[in-house]
């Protein structure tokens, strides 16, 4: 189903609903627009924290996985209208997984190395339950039943998949 975005471009929503939103068919900004949207704000540690600093902050109890997922979603919301870098979001699932990791950190269990870290996956990698289009409108309704090997390993290491990033059609 095509739905208009606030800027008048098209947005597609598949069977999984809004929690698995797809943002195909949007204009990509010029380098100047991209720079104004994100880089002019400065790429500070606060705006663009490293994976290591995020994991350390969670281990010290200064940040939660839920905080990091929400911050990631906010940053995507700020920059993506210009960048069109993220084409599918899995907000509800990511927040549910983040809450589970937050509980695990509180229990002080032995945790996997990426426990609670928000990540984005290229759209040419199958992600169970999250739309995988291969960058093609032909696959807008494809929701895999299994993860690709790399996604399976990331999840096993504790990563929280927030969404999928744009690629050229079929990665060509």
Where are these regions (language model features)?
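Intrinsic low-complexity, disordered N-terminal segments enriched in polar/charged/small residues
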Residues: 1, 15-18
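Hydrophobic, low-acid, alpha-helix-prone terminal segments
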Residues: 1-9, 27, 31-34
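Hydrophobic face of alpha-helices
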Residues: 2, 6, 66-70, 95, ...
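Intrinsically disordered, low-complexity segments enriched in small polar residues
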Residues: 21, 26-27
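An N-terminal boundary/leader segment
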Residues: 33-93
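Long amphipathic alpha-helix in the N-terminal Rossmann-like dinucleotide-binding domain
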Residues: 92-99, 158-159, 168
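Immediate post-signal peptide segment of exported/extracytoplasmic ligand-binding proteins
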Residues: 101-117
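Short glycine/serine-rich loop/turn segments
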Residues: 113-172
């Amino acid at each position: 189903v095509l739905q208009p975005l606030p800027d008048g471009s098209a947005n597609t929503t598949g069977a999984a609903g809004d929690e698995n939103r797809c943002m195909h068919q949007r204009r990509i900004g010029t380098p100047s627009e991209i720079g104004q949207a994100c880089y002019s704000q400065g790429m500070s540690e606060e705006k663009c924290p490293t994976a290591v600093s995020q994991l350390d902050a969670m281990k010290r109890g200064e940040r939660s996985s839920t905080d990091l997922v929400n911050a990631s979603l906010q940053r995507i919301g700020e920059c993506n209208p210009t960048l069109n870098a993220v084409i599918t979001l899995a907000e509800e699932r990511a927040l549910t997984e983040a809450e589970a990791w937050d509980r695990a950190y509180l229990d002080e269990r032995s945790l996997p190395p990426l426990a609670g870290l928000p990540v984005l996956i290229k759209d040419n990698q199958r992600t169970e339950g999250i739309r995988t289009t291969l960058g093609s409108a032909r696959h807008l309704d494809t929701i895999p039943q299994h993860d690709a090997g790399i996604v399976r390993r990331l999840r096993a290491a504790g990563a929280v998949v927030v969404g999928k990033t744009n690629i050229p059609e079929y990665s060509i």
